[in-house]
Amino acid sequence: MKKIILQLIIVLVFILLKVEGVYSSSPMNYYNITTFEGLPSNTVNAIKKDASGFIWIGTKVGLCRFDGCEVKTYPLLSEDDIWSIEELDSDTLLLGTVSGLKYFSRKTNVTVKLDIPSAIVKSIRKIADSQFLVGTEAGLYFINNHTPRQIFLE
């Protein structure tokens, strides 16, 4: 009986070593991006990868773009706490900020505030082409073809 238990323990040890080898053979690669690498703040509220492969980062003090090598900060938004990012089209991002909802043109680096009551925009979700749900502290909004409409939930 002791011999069988010893054999089972040896087999179990070999199985566990084999499983550990499988997991250790594919290490996870990651980057740690901080103010040292160019972020204006280490407080990151939103991350979005666009269709071009850029990673957009919404921080406590503005918007940044990471291309895999370097961080670019957009100073036009340096005073805005960005909570949410969605891609509207190949040129435009939709940004949820503490001062409302804004369009950001990637070609011109210009922001335009969308006409909704001033409220902190906490989340934006794309539900179809040119259709978004926007969660604010003042309620929920539905945007269709750039036209916002408040949704009242009962």
Where are these regions (language model features)?
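Carboxylate-rich, polar loop motifs that coordinate divalent cations or form catalytic acidic clusters
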Residues: M1-E154
